[in-house]
Amino acid sequence: MGNLFSRTKSPATELERVVLSIEDFKKRLQTISASNSSTLYYYYMGVIIILSIAMAHTWLRFDDPTKTYVACALVFGATVIVLTGRYIINCFFAWRTNRTTQKLENAITQKTVLLDLVKETLKFKEAKEILDRYEEKTEAGNTPTENSKLIHQQKQQNETLVSKTIMKPDQKRVETPVSQKPVPSKPGIAFDSMNMTPYQQRNSNATPVRPFLRQSTALDRILDYFMSDGPNCRNALICSICHTHNGMSVPAEYPFISFRCFECGHLNAAKKMGPHLPITRPPMGPKGIQHNGRAGPVPPKNQQPVVPMENPNPSTDLTPSASQHGSDSEPEKNADETAVVEKS
């Protein structure tokens, strides 16, 4: 007859009760651990106080040879009492912890069953409200641990790559062990890998550009401030597709730089075209030789090249002539011409 008059509870009410019990069990576990440590602390302090009182009473009551034996017996007995009491206290609180943990696991399984029941029985709007209220907490509590594991593995891989590239040739190679456990595959990650472009698949394990900049000192920061050469005075190269940072450039060169994104491979064109300098011919030298060391223009075909006259009878006089001083006198030229005519 009791079942006829009993009222069935809604899944939302049951879920609320189960969630409250789960929070209560978690608080109880924290209280049990705190009680365990505090009980051991007070137990140790009580044993030390009792042992010190017994030692003082023994030292004042008994004579010299007897009080030594009694003191040794008290120390041995106190040690046995401390170890035995510690074992009993730890066993008691371990039993309480196991029982509370089992109740917590049962409550969590009951919660999952109720959530599945809500998905199957209630309407979409009511089920969505209940799931948004209770299911987000569990997912938010599980995802950070998985993300932290993935981030930790990625950091280990980056540390190994950095140690390999920065290592000097005279140093020994020391490689940090990387865990060989496979990363848990998810459908979202597999779908993203299927939708990746060939450039992204080829550069999925690419390493950043080396070398890494050393850490700036106080002197470097002062010089950067006065010379306007620090990171604050430079423009960042940001990809227009994935908004990834691809290094920095000087403000004067920023509008004319085109770069390819390290993450997605998109070619970011320069915002401006560089200035084109006019092509100018270099000036001509005195003997048809340009200042850049090249020969001058070729004379036309009809024009005969001018052949300079060579002196058939070079002088053997070692005295410097007038031509060496920069000018030739007319009498010397006439004398040379007459000498050539007589010989011919």
From Swiss-Prot:
Record's GO cellular component terms: endoplasmic reticulum membrane; endoplasmic reticulum tubular network; membrane; synapse
Compositional bias of kind Polar residues: 140-155, 312-326
UniProt GO molecular function: zinc ion binding
Coiled-coil stretches noted in the UniProt entry, renumbered to this chain: 116-140
Lumenal side: 61-68
Cytoplasmic-side segments: 1-39, 90-344
Region (Disordered): 136-155, 171-192, 275-344
Pfam families: Zn_ribbon_10 (PF10058)
Membrane topology classification: Multi-pass membrane protein
Transmembrane annotation, as ranges: 40-60, 69-89
The entry's keywords: Coiled coil, Endoplasmic reticulum, Membrane, Metal-binding, Transmembrane, Transmembrane helix, Zinc, Zinc-finger
ZnF segments: C4-type: 239-264
Compositionally biased intervals (Basic and acidic residues): 327-344
Highest taxon in the source lineage: Eukaryota
Subcellular location: Endoplasmic reticulum membrane
GO BP annotations listed: chemical synaptic transmission; endoplasmic reticulum tubular network organization; regulation of protein localization; synapse assembly
Reported function: Plays a role in tubular endoplasmic reticulum network formation and maintenance. May be involved in central nervous system development. Has a presynaptic role in neurotransmission. Likely to operate in synaptogenesis by regulating vesicular transport or localization. Required for correct localization of rab-3 and snb-1.
Family per record: Belongs to the lunapark family.
Record's protein name: Endoplasmic reticulum junction formation protein lunapark-1
Species name: Caenorhabditis briggsae
Gene that produces this protein: lnp-1
